[in-house]
Curated annotation (Swiss-Prot):
InterPro entries: GHMP_kinase_C_dom, GHMP_kinase_C_sf, GHMP_kinase_N_dom, IspE, Ribosomal_Su5_D2-typ_SF, Ribsml_uS5_D2-typ_fold_subgr. Belongs to the GHMP kinase family. IspE subfamily. It catalyses: 4-CDP-2-C-methyl-D-erythritol + ATP = 4-CDP-2-C-methyl-D-erythritol 2-phosphate + ADP + H(+). One of its GO terms (biological process) is terpenoid biosynthetic process. The active site is at 9, 135. This is Putative 4-diphosphocytidyl-2-C-methyl-D-erythritol kinase. GO terms for molecular function: 4-(cytidine 5'-diphospho)-2-C-methyl-D-erythritol kinase activity; ATP binding. It comes from Staphylococcus epidermidis (strain ATCC 35984 / DSM 28319 / BCRC 17069 / CCUG 31568 / BM 3577 / RP62A). ATP binds at residues 93-103. Catalyzes the phosphorylation of the position 2 hydroxy group of 4-diphosphocytidyl-2C-methyl-D-erythritol.
């Protein structure tokens, strides 16, 4: 039995630069991890099947599951002639902008690499993982990084300063393709990628909070005004910085002090079913 942990990611920044010829958007984003995790275990089978064992109403256990897709890709690429049972204990909320599915897929690739003794480097796994998800290369490494291209170009950055994180996911679903479709690339915008990288380089917490920026945030907020209400609530209750992660709908607030973080948690807990008080990992 092999075990892997799959931490959630958050965006410090997210910029979309232009629409590529392959239909994807060219992006630049700074991401890190938080200590909200899914836990996965992997056990060999003798029947050559890939079986995903998960008890969750909104997560498929068939070939639509990203962990299944990752395993299928690994089996095909490395000619694996055995089976595997992938058990997922899920804490990361679904369709939240926290890369829960990608984190599970990345953990599956790392786990199968160990289970079957494939000897692949993390770089090799990341290069393979981009075939099934743009966040998977980042999730393979689980280190603070700036990701460019489709997400496959990963440049590591220093770990962020220590901080509490309050994550709040409203009870709405957001389709990432719909958000990108609604994005107007001609609109003026400011995303503070360089300021964010400087903040991490200098371990400057306040500069980091001032650099939080996401080009998709106003698009998702226009679709779902509750996202803005949660962000405003967090800032009014003392968050040092707040931002929507990914294409949403999860919003997070940063706080240096535990009491400050608990105040924010209590303020948003009444209006969101899924609220988490965690720490930055990086």
């Amino acid at each position: 039995m092999i075990y892997e942990t799959a931490p959630a990611k958050i965006n410090f920044t997210l910029d979309t630069l232009f629409k590529r010829d392959d239909g994807y958007h060219e992006i630049e984003m700074v991401m890190t991890t938080v200590d909200l995790n899914d836990r996965l275990s992997f056990e060999k089978r003798t029947d050559n099947k890939i079986v995903v064992d998960i008890e969750h109403n909104y997560v498929p256990n068939d070939n639509k599951n990203l962990a299944y897709k990752a395993a299928d890709l690994m089996f095909e690429r490395f000619n694996i002639n055995e089976g595997v049972t992938i058990s997922i204990d899920k804490d990361i909320p679904v369709s939240a902008g926290l890369a829960g599915g990608s984190a599970d897929a990345a953990a599956t690739m790392r786990g199968l690499n160990r289970l079957f003794g494939l000897g692949q480097s993390l770089d090799a796994l990341a290069a393979l993982g981009i075939q099934i998800g743009t966040d998977i290369p980042f999730c393979i490494y689980n280190q603070t990084a700036v990701c460019t291209g489709r997400g496959e170009q990963v440049t590591f950055l220093k770990r962020p300063p220590s901080a509490w994180v309050v994550l709040a996911k409203p009870n709405i679903g957001i389709s990432s393709p719909d958000v990108f479709k609604a994005l107007d690339l001609t609109e003026e915008h400011i995303v503070h990628n360089e300021k964010c990288k400087q903040a991490l380089e200098n371990n400057d917490y306040h500069l980091l909070c001032n650099s939080l920026s996401n080009r998709l945030e106003p698009v998702s907020m226009a679709m779902h005004p509750d996202i803005k209400k949660i962000k405003d609530n967090m800032l009014q209750c003392g968050a040092d910085g707040a931002l929507m992660s990914g294409s949403g709908p999860t919003v997070y607030g940063l706080a240096q002090k535990e009491r400050q973080a608990k105040n924010i948690y209590n303020a948003v807990n009444g209006c969101c079913n899924e609220v988490y008080l965690v720490r930055l990992l990086g």
